[in-house]
């Protein structure tokens, strides 16, 4: 088996309470079952890859938060980048794009209205995602995704851009905001983290899983989705969200309602989401 500890667990739509402490739980990822079962662990050889070839160096530092072992970046410092070739404006979107000159990730916050974030699909945020696509292409950003492109970067195209959100309705809303000419097999891909597993693009735009969420659920705090969303890019990743997420994480007390003998996945998810947010906060990477 090839298993990624950061992968998304299978989606199960039936009650699984009776299997929660089973040594061969059918609803858990097979690699995790093998590692936690003493009999299977004894006959399993574990090989850990110590180098990530997809991500830039600072993104590897960020994604390491999701793993129980450390790994390094294959890419040399300064090898990967995204930078505009046209004059930028003083807009917040352009400011976020300029931040990617020296960093590979940035969080763009959209104001939450007096009535709170929309309960249904956040069409305003969907338009923000489309606006980022428009600006990236209008600024004719040049991108380097490997050592071969560092000294000869190429101009970013729609096929270099991917968009990810945890909900299908949001992805549909984003798709409706994008020109049809930019979509399709050889254009921008917009889908869920589950369908992004194993794939990559030069630039990713991700809707933060907690955007619009006031009381995070186990689904919202599941770290596999955030890990996938933060690790699909070769050069740059832009997270977009309503501006309440930091406060939501600070005020939320996760409920430890797991079965006896099982790990506290909700508490761990809250801690990793908080570490992810604070990583950007401490480096002034929240616009």
Per-range role (PLM):
Residues 1-287:
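Conserved helicase motor core of SF1/SF2 NTP-dependent helicases
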